[in-house]
Structure formats: structure tokens, C-alpha cells
């Protein structure tokens, strides 16, 4: 009888382990979904601030079979958009600074060897 009792306890523990793993997996999937949704909302907000049409942004991010060829076309090239782009893309700021410093350091010589800069 003791043998049957230990088997029963073992099966109970195994079942509890499976249930625990299933609950952990469900919680992990919920967190992944929440993180993805938060990321999409942030991306849509960034693109909206850059001057893109919110409907186009939604179609590009969410996507649907009817309008698979949507392009983000209506970008406005004004100072506010450029500033917003700089805020959202700090890497591009670094590249722009390097290019600017390179351009400032380059000296252009004419055929007589005189610097024009």
C-alpha cells in the first residue's frame, strides 16, 4: 500500500510541475505580447511625430492583405521633422557630426597650391 501511495504522490508532483510550467509559459507569452504592443505604439508615435500619415503608419505596422504596397510617402522636410528625426535617431547625430568635422577639416587646394578654405 505504501508503494501505491508514493506513486500517487509522484504523479501528483509531476502534474503540478506540468501545470506550473504551463502557467509560466502563459505568463511569458503575455509579457512578450505586451512588450511587442508597447513597441508598436512607440514606433507609431515616433513615425507620427516625423510627419507620416497615421493611417499609413498603421497599415505599415499592422499590415493587411488588401494594401500590402503602402508606402510612407508624405514626409515633410521641415525643421520640426528634422529635429524630431535627430531626437529619435541619436546614431545619425553622431554620423552627421563626424561628417561635419571631416568637411571642416578638409582643405581644398587649387592648381597653384593655395587653400581656398
Curated annotation (Swiss-Prot):
GO terms for cellular component: host cell cytoplasm; viral capsid, decoration. It is found in: Virion; Host cytoplasm. Belongs to the lagovirus VP2 protein family. Disulfide bonds: none annotated. Transmembrane segments: none annotated. Homooligomer. The portal-like structure consists in 12 copies of VP2. Interacts with capsid protein VP1. Its main location: virion. The N-terminus domain points away from the virion surface. This is Minor capsid protein VP2. Translated by a ribosomal termination-reinitiation process from the bicistronic mRNA coding for VP1 and VP2. Minor structural protein that forms a portal-like structure at a unique three-fold axis of symmetry, following binding to the host receptor. The channel formed by VP2 may allow the delivery of the viral genome through the host endosomal membrane. Keywords: Capsid decoration protein, Capsid protein, Host cytoplasm, Virion.
Amino acid at each position: 500500500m505504501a508503494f501505491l501511495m508514493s506513486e500517487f504522490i509522484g504523479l501528483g508532483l509531476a502534474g503540478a510541475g506540468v501545470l506550473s510550467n504551463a502557467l509560466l509559459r502563459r505568463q511569458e507569452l503575455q509579457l512578450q505580447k505586451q512588450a511587442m504592443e508597447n513597441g508598436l505604439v512607440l514606433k507609431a508615435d515616433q513615425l507620427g511625430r516625423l510627419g507620416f500619415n497615421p493611417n499609413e503608419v498603421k497599415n505599415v505596422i499592422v499590415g493587411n492583405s488588401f494594401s500590402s504596397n503602402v508606402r510612407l510617402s508624405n514626409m515633410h522636410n521641415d525643421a520640426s521633422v528634422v529635429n524630431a528625426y535627430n531626437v529619435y535617431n541619436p546614431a545619425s547625430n553622431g554620423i552627421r557630426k563626424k561628417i561635419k568635422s571631416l568637411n571642416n577639416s578638409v582643405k581644398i587646394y587649387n592648381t597653384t597650391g593655395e587653400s581656398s578654405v
